[in-house]
């Protein structure tokens, strides 16, 4: 990946993480940064995940565990537990960069 694509990828990732953190600070829900089929990042919580499943935007057999496994970032739970460790965040960030380079 050249430097300009890398800079764009870092900006896209940081904006998605900031949007997830802002949404979490508003109501305390856990938010996930997920890839979409059109090559963008979406910030989704569990409630919207189930709505998207109901409308068949997401396969019916997808679960919250799948969402946690495939997300690039997630906020902690309302009580503060479940925060992603720094090494997992770095691993997910590198997975995002690989995904961004392939799209």
Provide a role label for each language-model segment.
Residues 2-103:
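Acidic/polar low-complexity segments and flexible, solvent-exposed patches
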